[in-house]
Regions:
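Phosphate-handling DNA/RNA-contact segment within nucleic-acid enzymes
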Residues: 1-114, 118, 131-132
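A charged alpha-helical hairpin associated with nucleic-acid processing machineries
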Residues: 26-27, 68-74, 102-118, 122-267
Length: 267
C-alpha cells in the first residue's frame, strides 16, 4: 500500500514524510490505501498509494464509508481529504472526495448508487474549473444532472467553511446551478466578452450545447433564450441544431450557423 518507498540508491524511506496521512477506506469499511497532504510547499500537494490489487483510485471515493451511514440523499463532491473533514466537522456529513481533481466514470457510477442529488464543489483555480467541466459531462453521460457550487473569493471548501461557517456554505449550495445552466452561463460569458464581429461566431457554441440536451422541455427553454439573444427564429435555430446532431463526429463539425443559413442583424 506504499507507505515505504525504495530510492534509486536502494535505500528505503518514508514516502509520506512531511505529510499529513489519511487512511483511504472503501465503501465496505476496509483500509485499502493512504493519502498524504503536504504540510509545506512540497509537490504534489496530494499523494496517494500506488495502484494495486486492493487500491484502485478510479473505483473509490474518500469519505464514502461515512456517507453510507447517513440518510441524506444529497452528496457534495470535493477534491481533497481536508475538504471532506472540514465539511464534516461543520455538520456537512455528506461530502466525498474524488482523490484528486479528476473524477472517473467508475466513481460517478458509485455516487449514482447512493445519492439522488449530486453537488460538485471543486476549487475555482484553472485545474479545478477544468475538472468541474469534466465531472459535469461525466455525470450527464450517466443520466445525472449535477449541480455546481461556486464559492466566492477563490476559496476551496475547507477554507470557505472555516471562514464563513455552515450556514453560508448551505446558502451557496442552495444557489448551485444545475449542469445545463452552468454550461449555458459559461458560454454566455464567452459571448459577452466577444466583440460585435465575433459574437456571431459564438453561436456555434450555443448550438453544440443545445444539441447535447436530451430532455425536450429543458432544451426548449434554452432554445428560447438563444433565440432571443441572437434574434433568431426558433425554427431556424432548430434546423441548425439538427444539422449539428446529424454531422457530429465529422471533422468539420463547426460553423453550423452557416450551414443552416442563419443571418444575424447586429443590434
Amino acid at each position: 500500500i506504499g507507505l515505504i518507498k525504495k530510492s534509486d540508491k536502494g535505500k528505503y524511506y518514508d514516502k509520506y514524510r512531511n505529510r499529513i496521512i489519511f487512511p483511504i477506506i472503501n465503501h465496505y469499511g476496509n483500509v485499502i490505501g493512504f493519502g498524504g497532504r503536504s504540510i509545506d510547499d512540497q509537490m504534489p500537494k496530494y499523494l496517494n498509494s500506488p495502484e494495486s490489487d486492493i487500491f484502485k483510485k478510479r473505483y473509490n471515493l474518500y469519505g464514502l464509508n461515512v456517507y453510507k451511514r447517513q440518510k441524506n440523499k444529497d452528496i457534495v463532491l470535493v477534491e481533497g481529504y481536508m475538504d471532506v473533514i472540514a465539511l464534516n466537522n461543520h455538520g456537512i456529513d455528506y461530502a466525498v472526495a474524488s482523490l484528486g481533481t479528476a473524477l472517473t466514470l467508475d466513481q460517478a457510477k458509485l455516487i449514482k448508487r447512493y445519492a439522488d442529488n449530486v453537488y460538485i464543489c471543486y476549487d475555482r483555480d484553472s485545474a479545478g474549473i477544468k475538472a468541474t467541466d469534466k465531472a459535469v459531462e461525466i455525470f450527464l453521460n450517466i443520466g445525472i444532472v449535477a449541480k455546481v457550487i461556486v464559492l466566492e473569493d477563490g476559496l476551496d471548501p475547507d477554507e470557505f467553511i472555516k471562514k464563513y461557517g455552515k450556514e453560508k456554505f448551505l446558502e451557496k449550495k442552495g444557489e448551485a446551478l444545475d449542469s445545463y445552466n452552468y454550461k449555458y452561463n459559461k458560454i454566455l460569458d464567452i459571448y459577452s466578452k466577444a466583440n460585435q464581429n465575433e459574437k456571431f461566431e459564438k453561436l456555434d457554441l450555443f448550438i453544440e450545447f443545445l444539441s447535447s440536451i436530451d430532455k425536450e422541455l429543458t432544451r426548449e427553454i434554452f432554445i428560447n433564450n438563444v433565440s432571443t439573444l441572437f434574434s433568431i427564429d426558433k425554427s431556424t435555430l432548430n434546423e441548425a441544431i439538427n444539422k449539428y446532431s446529424t454531422d457530429t463526429g465529422n471533422k468539420d463539425k463547426f460553423n453550423y450557423s452557416k450551414k443552416a443559413n442563419i443571418t444575424i442583424v447586429p443590434s
